Amino acid sequence: MIIEIVGKFYDNHSLTIINRNIALILSENDNIDLYITPLDDYTPDAGLDKKVVKKLKDISAKEIDGNSYPDIQIRHSYPPIWQWPTDERTKVVYIQPWEYPKLPFEWQHKWETFADHVIVPSNYIRDIAVRGGLNPQSITVVPNGYNEQLFNKEEPKSLPYGIDSNKF
């Protein structure tokens, strides 16, 4: 299966971190031929691990054979990319967070036009999309993950920062 991810990969924005981790995990699956289309360039300011950058650069350097096409194109960016995939057989999946009580009006129509499926990180966003008119069968909730090496319950609690909790 050929999967392409379109989005940012090289900064520390929340969408970028998710894209980067999805790409790194999918790249380890022998049943997936992964390609990425970065919408950003690497900058050392992000402080990314050199091994991660090398892996992403190696993936982004790959080109899809002229006779092939992505089976699935995952789009995770803001604003969303509203365009047809390069091949009509490619299924387009949007990953789309949202933080407000209503989606932009045009998104419902554009998702119906361009998306084969939409993934959102919470039931709250799913409910907003469904209330906005999106077919409930075309949307799935997949919560954002966390890195248990960074957020480890066994680590000692953080030291207080000298903030008076009675004031807040």
Residue map of PLM features:
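Nucleotide donor/acceptor-binding cores
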Residues: M1, T90, N166-F168
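N-terminal subdomain of nucleotide-sugar transferases
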Residues: M1-T43
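Extended catalytic core of nucleotide-activated donor transferases of GT-like folds
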Residues: E4, T43-V130
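Conserved donor-binding loops in enzymes that form glycosidic bonds
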Residues: K8-F9, P97-W98, N144
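Structural alpha-beta junctions
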Residues: L26-Y35, A115-H117, N123, N135-S138
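Hydrophobic residues at beta-strand termini and immediately following loops
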Residues: T37, I95, V142
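Acidic anion/phosphate-binding donor-loop and adjacent secondary structure
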Residues: F105-W107, G145-F168
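Helix-loop-beta element that forms the nucleotide-linked donor phosphate-binding surface
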Residues: R126-Y146, K153-E154
